[in-house]
Amino acid sequence: MGKAAAPSRGGGCGGRSRGLSSLFTVVPCLSCHTAAPGMSASTSGSGPEPKPQPQPVPEPERGPLSEQVSEAVSEAVPRSEPVSETTSEPEPGAGQPSELLQGSRPGSESSSGVGAGPFTKAASEPLSRAVGSATFLRPESGSLPALKPLPLLRPGQAKTPLGVPMSGTGTTSSAPLALLPLDSFEGWLLKWTNYLKGYQRRWFVLGNGLLSYYRNQGEMAHTCRGTINLSTAHIDTEDSCGILLTSGARSYHLKASSEVDRQQWITALELAKAKAVRVMNTHSDDSGDDDEATTPADKSELHHTLKNLSLKLDDLSTCNDLIAKHGAALQRSLTELDGLKIPSESGEKLKVVNERATLFRITSNAMINACRDFLELAEIHSRKWQRALQYEQEQRVHLEETIEQLAKQHNSLERAFHSAPGRPANPSKSFIEGSLLTPKGEDSEEDEDTEYFDAMEDSTSFITVITEAKEDSRKAEGSTGTSSVDWSSADNVLDGASLVPKGSSKVKRRVRIPNKPNYSLNLWSIMKNCIGRELSRIPMPVNFNEPLSMLQRLTEDLEYHHLLDKAVHCTSSVEQMCLVAAFSVSSYSTTVHRIAKPFNPMLGETFELDRLDDMGLRSLCEQVSHHPPSAAHYVFSKHGWSLWQEITISSKFRGKYISIMPLGAIHLEFQASGNHYVWRKSTSTVHNIIVGKLWIDQSGDIEIVNHKTNDRCQLKFLPYSYFSKEAARKVTGVVSDSQGKAHYVLSGSWDEQMECSKVMHSSPSSPSSDGKQKTVYQTLSAKLLWKKYPLPENAENMYYFSELALTLNEHEEGVAPTDSRLRPDQRLMEKGRWDEANTEKQRLEEKQRLSRRRRLEACGPGSSCSSEEEKEADAYTPLWFEKRLDPLTGEMACVYKGGYWEAKEKQDWHMCPNIF
């Protein structure tokens, strides 16, 4: 390389031209008038800076590639912060020329070469031992830091765009925090493990909407101790240094070392959660539409792409050789011309040719060197990426084998528990559907990192003490408030609420369906490629379905409609709230054994339930959206109430379980009183996906609000825990008025019954050992609100359908041509012809894809839609519902616009699309 003058202390670009020095060596820097590589200049502290003088430029010299590219790091260790060390070397001063440095050469002092260049200077000592034997060079005063080539990290290691480990609790960063990705973070946190070891130090990594933790940084490449998805997690704070993350039945109790670290983590977690929710909403889809699972064809395409890239790299190498060959031939020809005797009149022309040839030689040499550098780097990184890809493939296979092996161990432990002596007499009460034993061993992570919660943590936030009605008659008289009903009266509207006899229908309904065939199918072979994905986008055979659609499942929630019929006659709004709460819980009673998924409705599919004669209601559902899949529902009762909702079901496979999250508000209005109730559904979780007996759990909080009186009911679905003293599937709640005064306490289980107890007096309890304080409610004896109907005979062979569910898919005359009863694949499955049902299901899905493409094409380029989801929403208009702004929730929701029952009466279905 040519020599370069160092910039003055007063400023200068300090290496701005460095990136082009290997291509064009005569480039002055116009912004600060300093000389770029290939020029000489002297600087002065006070006098004017001299103009750059051109220098003869030799052919660029290149050091060995091994000195320019650092070796891969063999272990993921944190790098210490670069510490600037003081040296005794004098820096360039006023009137004194700076030290001139040569380019990197083999054998020179700076031949270690990592980051060496025309504006760098060898430091007196290595910066850090954390990156192997590579030495970092200190830049001169007033110049930018020397560029440091970044070693290739192993798969699983994280790095910021600046090449600095991401800061977190307990780490130090040499880059400002503002430059780091805001939704990515890593560092040390204290995590609650168990009561024996308390909080333990763990390395946490936040990225891609997932929070994972390891015992140390060395485990990042091979062993993840746990992961929580932030898109479904709730972030809460306990104290000045605490963070609580809850997702379904999983909770992380974390502590930071300081308030600053805690705030940084909370900010990063909230940003990552918001981004994950946006991604989840953007990528939700229906069954098997445009996102197929990884197939051998995909792998073949990947290898084909890699092969093409390799061929292109070979072509580039050949072109490089040709350029070098022809350049050498041209140089030889010019040398031969110089030796020839040429007449004097041709001397000027030959001089011009020589000048142009010299310029071409300089340019071509620089291009050849740059091309050679690129080829060598590309070959090195190509091999590294090939190894990384192979490593990831091996890790995936290893992960699949590990999960399958763990699932088998889990199943064997479950069987051992069932056959163990001294089992509870009533296994259903002890929740045997889940694994009640935890595998423990020397290598088990459960020894330290399994969360153990006591009863206080899983239990309710209040304590109930039952008192006698006679003893507290005076208190009851003064505390009834809005209640006008005597609790001990025989005609209390809440007494016997669940004992209402079922209505008798004039139409004889069926009481059984064909038995479920015994088809064996490996669920893991399908689910292993679906971790973290939206299940509605994954095509699955009907073997995992039940012969009902999601629209029919929504209608099945009306099985205990008599609770609402009875609530119409309540004169007290808080008593009415008790019945509404019992109705909201009763909708989960049918899910306890229903482990099969319903059919995803086709866009425009409908389902009606016309049972005015026996149930006194009419119900209509319509699939109103394809991206994301969403269903609108409207119910009218002749007893004086109406219910409507738009529900979007988001379901994802998390490796060990499936998480089902219903999104959307449910509205219930009583015409006589004008009371308007709004609530949302809880989260459902399906466990033991890979091996073992499937079981379902409900968890989360539900708040029911009466927007007329501002009465509220707080329901809590307690998730199942191995070590909880609470009963399985327990639900608790408190009904309070607009002033926050509690009137009723609710208790029960979502699969059996619900009771309510009238509150006579409430007082705070003494603080517990953990500092938490509960409210003590003195109540009267509990009254039964709702009790589950027994299942029909032989229900275990009929998908555990209830009496109402058995009638939902029964063929009826006069329904719309889009009704779920007319769906052919669902009908074939009900009859036990599953192979034909799978073939028909594929035909319907392909027909739906074709209709979707036509809608997107009809939207046109001139439309205001920016995404495919917006285009489809803009192109498709529901037939019986319309989008309106909900004034209570502030959300857009589909509400019934009328016309269906009139069309049915006339049997005029010309407006219905042909979807089957």
UniProtKB/Swiss-Prot annotation:
It comes from Homo sapiens. Residues 49-58 have a biased composition (Pro residues). This is Oxysterol-binding protein 2. Binds 7-ketocholesterol. Acts during spermatid development where its function is required prior to the removal of cytoplasm from the sperm head. Residues 182-274 form the PH domain. Expressed mainly in retina, testis, and fetal liver. Residues 99-113 have a biased composition (Polar residues). Residues 79-92, 144-155 have a biased composition (Low complexity). One of its GO terms (molecular function) is cholesterol binding. It is found in: Membrane; Cytoplasmic vesicle, Secretory vesicle, Acrosome. The gene is OSBP2. GO terms for biological process: lipid transport; spermatid development. Keywords: Cytoplasmic vesicle, Differentiation, Lipid transport, Lipid-binding, Membrane, Phosphoprotein, Spermatogenesis, Transport. It is a peripheral membrane protein. It holds the Pfam family Oxysterol_BP. Interacts with CCDC159. One of its GO terms (cellular component) is plasma membrane. Belongs to the OSBP family. Residues 1-20, 34-121, 139-163, 282-301, 417-448, 813-842 are annotated as: Disordered. InterPro entries: OSBP_sf, Oxysterol-bd, Oxysterol-bd_CS, PH-like_dom_sf, PH_domain. The modification Phosphoserine is found at S287, S763.
